[in-house]
From Swiss-Prot:
Keywords: Acetylation, Cytoplasm, Protease inhibitor, Thiol protease inhibitor. Gene3D superfamilies: 3.10.450.10. SUPFAM superfamilies: Cystatin/monellin (SSF54403). The modification N-acetylmethionine is found at M1. This is Cystatin-B. It is found in: Cytoplasm. CDD domains: CY. Widely expressed. Highest expression in heart, liver and kidney. Lower levels in brain, lung and skeletal muscle. Lowest levels in spleen and testis.
Length: 98
């Protein structure tokens, strides 16, 4: 993978689900709703001055959200940040940079 270029889409892992779970409350606050279903499906990784994770999350009802989560470098000792997100996505929608 080139620095700065997003990776290919990969199936979600336990680590991906953990990241999604950590920013779930940020999304719920921004959207003013609770998500009973919040299951990571797939992800892409982009190495920058830290890591951007693009995560497709199943939120139930045949709907998905796409999350862009920034993971700072370990020595910065900062929390994960929900940088951006897209709602009203479906499972077949491509996970791309946004």
């Amino acid at each position: 993978m080139m620095c700065g270029a997003p990776s290919a889409t990969m199936p979600a892992t336990a680590e991906t689900q953990e990241v999604a779970d950590q920013v779930k409350s940020q999304l719920e606050s921004k959207e003013n709703q609770k998500f009973d279903v919040f299951k990571a499906i797939s992800f892409k990784r982009q190495i920058v001055a830290g890591t951007n994770l693009f995560i497709k999350v199943d939120v139930g009802g045949d709907k998905c959200v796409h999350l862009r989560v920034f993971q700072p470098l370990p020595h910065e000792n900062k929390p994960l940040t929900l940088s951006s997100y897209q709602t009203n996505k479906e499972r077949h929608d491509e996970l791309s940079y946004f």
